[in-house]
Swiss-Prot record:
It comes from Oncorhynchus mykiss (Rainbow trout). This is Mineralocorticoid receptor. Residues 50-107 are annotated as: Hinge. Keywords: Cytoplasm, DNA-binding, Lipid-binding, Metal-binding, Nucleus, Receptor, Steroid-binding, Transcription, Transcription regulation, Zinc, Zinc-finger. Aldosterone binds at N145, Q151, R192, T320. A zinc finger (NR C4-type) spans 13-37. SMART domains: HOLI, ZnF_C4. The gene is nr3c2. Belongs to the nuclear hormone receptor family. NR3 subfamily. It comes from the Eukaryota. It holds the Pfam family zf-C4.
Length: 359
């Protein structure tokens, strides 16, 4: 575990990152074994503590329920409360150390953070698209919404083990995920499209790829062109996997409430750390690519452009959500919870995007 996290070994799974790891088969796949260690809460910080038995999770002061679980104070029903509960009750502490007294230490990044980002990157999700039905607008959009709901589950799990993220208050964690989910989804889509179709089609899932016909039939052709253009920019830049992973985290950390977060200082420190990680990733890129300074500028401009595209995608999402009955477009319960809570905040101008370059 120590060698993998510190980057001495970069393990890769020969399967689909879902190998069974138990007492007998623990040596079959080192990559899945390390992933399971991270999900179970192993971290380098705990090894340095003189009293490992007193290491506490974020939620240890929470009130137990009758079922033996734990709940967060003031949490309600639905996705946001369940997401908050999932973030707060998971044993995983995302490599954020706790002091002997149980208090959180300031968020930090362990050595070779890219090794950790590679290990926790979610697996590709299948849409379960019904190819026996015609590619009608409502069928395509409903399928995309169902896929987005599945992906959101992975986003929450990814955030739980993201180095530094668990050091933020639960309210801040939920807010950042809620404000960035569309950008994260479209950015990951662009990466898959870049790797699997060389930027020619939109690779939403292995069983749901948009060609030109599906783009036009989806009723969001211009938005599809925008997402494909991002993927083609990946092709032009020959974006590396390490750069993509660092940029993805920065998208999570780039939209905040206008009044700020509960712990704005911890958030800003975490964001600065990941900006440094992006610069390190650029420094590792092949020397045949653009000059380092110019490349960093190009990547941050691309991140800024993602916010503009994400805003347009949200507008379309909000429209189809409001007109879902008339358009016969279905939304999974998770997206209903997120969008219902997000619409008033976005449309009231309560969000603030952190751009790298002046608009």
């Amino acid at each position: 575990f120590k060698r993998a996290v510190e980057g001495q070994h970069n393990y890769l799974c020969a399967g689909r990152n879902d190998c069974i790891i138990d007492k007998i088969r623990r040596k079959n796949c080192p990559a899945c074994r390390v992933r399971k260690c991270l999900q179970a809460g192993m971290n380098l910080g705990a090894r340095k503590s003189k009293k490992p038995g007193k290491l506490k999770g974020v939620n240890e002061d929470s009130t137990p329920t009758k079922e033996g679980g734990q709940t967060c104070p003031g949490s309600g029903g639905g996705y946001l409360s369940s997401g908050e509960k999932e973030l707060s009750t998971s044993p995983t502490n995302a490599l954020v150390p706790h002091g002997p007294g149980g208090g959180l230490v300031t968020p930090y990044l362990p050595p070779s953070i890219c090794s950790v980002l590679e290990l926790i990157e979610p697996e590709v999700v299948f849409a379960g698209y019904d190819n026996t039905q015609p590619d009608t607008t409502d069928h395509l959009l409903s399928s995309l919404n169902q896929l987005a709901g599945k992906q959101m589950i992975r986003v929450v799990k990814w955030a739980k083990v993201l180095p530094g993220f668990r050091g933020l208050p639960i309210e801040d964690q939920i807010t950042l995920i809620q404000y960035s989910w569309m950008c994260l989804s479209s950015f990951s889509l662009s990466w898959r499209s870049y790797k699997h179709t060389n930027g020619q089609m939109l690779y939403f899932a292995p069983d749901l790829v948009f060609n030109e016909d599906r783009m036009q039939q989806s009723a969001m052709y211009d938005l599809c062109l925008g997402m494909r253009q991002v993927s083609q920019e990946f092709v032009r830049l020959q974006l590396t996997y390490q750069e993509f992973l660092s940029m993805k985290v920065l998208l999570l950390l780039s939209t905040v409430p206008k009044e700020g977060l509960k712990n704005q200082a911890a958030f800003e420190e975490m964001r600065v750390n990941y900006i440094k990680e992006l610069r390190r990733s650029v420094g590792k890129a092949p020397t045949t690519l653009d000059r380092r300074g110019n490349r960093s500028s190009q990547l941050t401009k691309l991140l800024d452009a993602m916010h503009d595209l994400g805003g347009e995608l949200l507008d379309f999402c909000f429209y189809t959500f409001r007109e879902s009955q008339a358009l016969k477009v279905e939304f999974p319960e998770m997206l209903v919870e997120i969008i219902s809570d997000q619409i008033p905040k976005v449309e009231s101008g309560n969000t603030h995007t952190l751009y790298f370059h002046k608009k």
